[in-house]
UniProtKB/Swiss-Prot annotation:
One of the record's GO molecular function terms: NADH:ubiquinone reductase (non-electrogenic) activity
Chief localization: membrane
Function: NDH-1 shuttles electrons from NADH, via FMN and iron-sulfur (Fe-S) centers, to quinones in the respiratory chain. The immediate electron acceptor for the enzyme in this species is believed to be ubiquinone. Couples the redox reaction to proton translocation (for every two electrons transferred, four hydrogen ions are translocated across the cytoplasmic membrane), and thus conserves the redox energy in a proton gradient.
One annotated GO biological process: ATP synthesis coupled electron transport
Species for this entry: Aeromonas hydrophila subsp. hydrophila (strain ATCC 7966 / DSM 30187 / BCRC 13018 / CCUG 14551 / JCM 1027 / KCTC 2358 / NCIMB 9240 / NCTC 8049)
Gene symbol of the encoding locus: nuoN
Enzyme nomenclature, EC number: 7.1.1.-
InterPro entries assigned to the protein according to its UniProt record, in alphabetical order: NADH-Q_OxRdtase_suN/2, ND/Mrp_TM
Assembly behavior: NDH-1 is composed of 14 different subunits. Subunits NuoA, H, J, K, L, M, N constitute the membrane sector of the complex.
Name the record gives this protein: NADH-quinone oxidoreductase subunit N
Amino acid sequence: MTFTASQLLALLPLLLTTGAMVALMLAIAWKRCDDTAFVVTIAGLNLALFSLPIVMAQGDQGVTPLLQIDGYAVFYMGLVLIGALATCTFGRSWLKGYPDNREEFYLLLLIATAGGLVLAGSRHLASLFIGIEMLTLPMFGLVGYAYRERHSLEASIKYMVLSAAATAFLLFGMALLYAQAGSLSFSDLGLTLATTPAHHPLLMGGLGLMLVGFAFKLSLAPFHLWTPDVYEGAPAPVATFLATVSKIAVFCVLLRFYLAVPAAADPMIHWLLAAMAVISIVIGNLLALLQTNIKRMMGYSSISHFGYLLAVIVASRLGQMPVEAAGVYLLMYLFTSLGAFGVISMMSSPYRGKDADSLHSYRGLFWRRPYLTAVLTVMMLSLAGIPMTLGFIGKFYLIGVTVDAKLWWLSGAIVLGSALGLYYYLRVMVTLYLREPGMQLRDAKGDWAITSGGLVVLLSAALVVALGLYPQPVISLVQGFQNVVLH
């Protein structure tokens, strides 16, 4: 097998991330220094991000039978790298209070990011599985990184056991599809399964088992039970990565698979996805109403947000509009989640025990840190889909797609879920502006705004507001990147 120069250039983000990974391993072996580890990680991720225009200039490139680097892949690679960079900067602040080895945090982060990049360009079940495993396995260590805390170890073990079960379902589903089609390529599966009789046992069984695996990775109901415990137990920067990079990478490969394999649009699978979307929206929002822990609340909130996004897959038989809607919504979800979890990271440190995840810890924050409060307020408004924020544009797109597909009941579920979500997001905002209690509460550092994590949080808030007021740059960006090559 030979590689052309264009194919190698198309792999630049993955090659640069892998190079940073190797350089970091050598640096750790030579001399432990968390400053060096941070610089190597940030440099590698930035180089990978700034290489994306070079990748786009190569056009659509099929790199081996495993990867397709097209506009769709480049867009989601960008989201993965932005999320990883933000996680790295939040981790820098959090690790300053960490008493043990810090360098492995960055190494595990780079490995997981490489897995996300593989998923963004995957067009083969083998690369899909490799990408998911590269993304998932480092998360076991990252979730349990604060291993002196019992809740962190518990979260890591739960995530590991349940993730192993989900991987078994995914692999078994792939095996059944291979037995029926004789190929693992998305395009070959699409061509072969299109001629397979409807409701063939191997076809339905394979697609159903794969759907279970994907549903776990996206924490969709009824496979969501791990989510609140893992979000609560994971360090705040790791929860950021779980909520953004991990889910965005898995969703983008699921959407490509669904578009490439027409058999996945079988009415039975179609209605199963639709039911899962509605259940996720309802359960995610109802359980979030009951939470007094902000990380658990964000965990349940993420269940509902990916329930909304399942509506895109249900409507995706209509053409490119659902693909565009998914891109806009995930861009909004990325920046909004980075801002919200960034504030939690600013308030947390291992020196002070558990993360500042109790809602009570944020009572009266406005009177101590008004600008940090403004950032969290903007993020809550955006997640609720309030006008003049990027969240409103994302929700508008989703409702537009479901209305266009005449899925009125699904549109109603999105509206109902948004109304329920408004209540618990407003509860967080009200808590921020209450008068401070007499007792001393957790607080961010006085110079939080000039730290790398603080700058990321402020930039995220500025983008959420600016792009909510004038969304055309986002729409044009997404439209320019959404060419999906399915062969």
